[in-house]
Amino acid sequence: MVDNSKNNTETLLCCSFCEKNQKEVKKLIAGLSAYICDECIKLCNNILEEENNNLSSYYDVKKKIPTPYEIFKHLDNYIIGQLHTKKVLSVAVYNHYKRLNHLNSKKNNNIELGKSNLLLIGPTGCGKTLLAETLAKFLDVPFSISDATTLTEAGYVGEDVENIIQRLLQKCNYNIKKAETGIIYIDEIDKISRKSENPSITRDVSGEGVQQALLKLIEGTLASVPMQGGRKHPQQEFLKVDTSKILFICGGAFLGLNKIIEKRTKLGTKIGFNAKVNKNLKICSKDALMQQVIPEDLIKFGLIPEFIGRLPILTILHELDKKMLVKILSEPKNALIKQYQTLFKLEDVELKICTKVIEYIAQKAMNQNTGARGLRSIIEMLLLDTMYRLPSMTNIKTIIIDESTIVNNNLTPILIYKKHDSKTTSGK
């Protein structure tokens, strides 16, 4: 007796890829000597679609390069002052993406264009990070920020330099082609200066060692980046990323660099009883001294010559004065005052902050030496009680923060009710 069920199973056709039989799938398409099911076709389509999207996003970024003037005007909408730095960044970024076009062009005439990474030097809160962030948003390219203080030489406790690339990959969902058109900002770069000007017999794993490790990465190499981040080990998978197409912007405050510059500029002056007094010698401000920086000063500070060579474009950001801080508070598109006014608008309340109060906030930030970074915390403290009580209050039309609000730390604003009668909060 023949077992029919057994014969039926044997005659079933199977997908050559997933090995599911024709009863387990909706459709089975036959080829010359193979079969493919509808599920495998769908999977293949998804893979091809994803690759096409990756390529299209890469080439879209590649083709649309704003002119230096357009980049400058956009930066001008969000950052107050720093005109020279904005001009330097605009030209450098335009040339960088023009270089990427040249690399991918069929008309490439075998002339290799070098990469020009940037070094931004300026005090804390002067806009170094904001400049890089605004650039990346405008160009619609992947952007990541890394802190140089966490980096150590390979084999020591801390982060490997490849983690910098890994952060960029995370920002673009591990799309390697897109990551290779990105911008990486390395903050606190001055903190990896070597501990002394002379080479030491002991290893400087978080200073000169990190600089040496960053050399090839910044210049351009095929970096092996661990998929899951962390330390490298032989068993894990690596992603290959060409860093020659990534623009690196390094920034730092370089505290004490002005003293090195001052010492260099006064070297020609003799001292002693018989020395002639140079009447033309002017006492320069710290800001003016920083504008005179040369690569030799950075070497004395602790950066190795090879590292400075990888950052050919150097620009100095000015220290922010009170007038600039007042403008930062109110003029840019995303100015802090406008942000808080929008926040209050969500409660259907208009917020008005008088000029004297804005000047007070700017002066307080100056006294704290925090630059523009300290402005938000000052405003938060100023509006804390008001923001605490406002959601529980009704019928409020306008809140006015005037000079009387800040006198003797009396943080009680003027409230204008919708019934058109002016009152002041009781402070309860």
From Swiss-Prot:
GO terms for biological process: cell division; proteolysis involved in protein catabolic process. Residues 1-56 form the ClpX-type ZB domain. ATP binds at P123, T124, G125, C126, G127, K128, T129, L130. Zn(2+) binds at C15, C18, C37, C40. Pfam families: AAA_2 (PF07724), ClpB_D2-small (PF10431), zf-C4_ClpX (PF06689). It comes from the Bacteria. The keyword Zinc applies. Signal peptide: none annotated. Coiled coil: none annotated. PANTHER family: ATP-DEPENDENT CLP PROTEASE ATP-BINDING SUBUNIT CLPX-LIKE, MITOCHONDRIAL, ATP-DEPENDENT CLP PROTEASE ATP-BINDING SUBUNIT CLPX-LIKE, MITOCHONDRIAL-RELATED. ATP-dependent specificity component of the Clp protease. It directs the protease to specific substrates. Can perform chaperone functions in the absence of ClpP. Component of the ClpX-ClpP complex. Forms a hexameric ring that, in the presence of ATP, binds to fourteen ClpP subunits assembled into a disk-like structure with a central cavity, resembling the structure of eukaryotic proteasomes. This is ATP-dependent Clp protease ATP-binding subunit ClpX. The gene is clpX.
